[in-house]
Amino acid sequence: MKIKLSLILTVAALALSGSAVAEVKIALVAKSLGNGFFEAANVGAQEAAKELGDVKVIYTGPTTTTAEAQIEVLNGLIAQGVDAIAISANDPDALVPVLKKAMQRGIKVVSWDSGVAKAGRQIHLNPSNNALIGETNVKLAADALKALNVEKGDVAVLSATPTSTNQNTWIAEMKKVLPKYPSVNLVTVAYGDDLSDKSYREAVGLLKTYPDLKVIVSPSSVGIVAAAQAVKDQGKIGKVYVTGLGLPSEMAGAVKSGASKSFAIWNPIDLGYAATYLADDLVKGTATKDEASMGKLGKVKLDADGSGAMAEPFVYDASNIDKFSKIF
């Protein structure tokens, strides 16, 4: 009888011990793997997990930037029984059914960077204020035209995919403020699908189709690097500037070569860090409808749709590129 009681107590102790160290499994889902922006976001996510202590971040994503590929990844995560999914979406609407299924099974859902429609998530974290991002891109283009001594010049946008939520929102915001920047003549929007080779081909196509093109604005960290390379390869340095949203580590060469005068971005490390904290806050039930924790970054204020903004974009140029290219 004593042996049986001892066994029961041992099993109970093991069960309690197991529950005490149970990990919160948070899946950080990128638009696609191999993209420096999302690799940097994962660095921040892992930092958040280390701070929280009881969180395991599973970094994953598809190899192609399609909704179908992300849906396959999401179904796998649902089958694994993760506690939360933090995703940068390839399509705002196509992912809703599978994410609804996840939420029905108790999985918390945060979208970050590129959002999911409200029905498919609980919180969305914009990297910055959308209107400010849009105007920053136009101002950068205007600054580039001024550096080229052009009073009014042709400007093209090289975006990611036609269904990319954040890219489309930023481009819409860019168009709204064009009247404030009369030097900027927007001629077209092209799509490189967040793929280096396609973005490069599209950039070359823009340079050939629009011989008077002066600036390419790419709000894609993949597209901006590809466009800068195209400008260099086509012998357009000093005649065409590339700007938009990019990573200092990937754009340092373009700034030094003269293919880019300046560009902007928020810190993707902070974005992954904040998304992980938000997911953890939802899992632990400490988030409210009005605000949620971003750890050391403070609280994010949420609107009626559950959306909030992290920080303002920051401009990088020859004066600071060396410093920040060593960080991300």
Residue ranges with predicted function:
Residues 1-21:
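Gram-negative bacterial Sec-dependent N-terminal signal peptides
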Residues 4-5, 22-328:
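A residue-level marker of the well-folded mature domains of exported/periplasmic proteins
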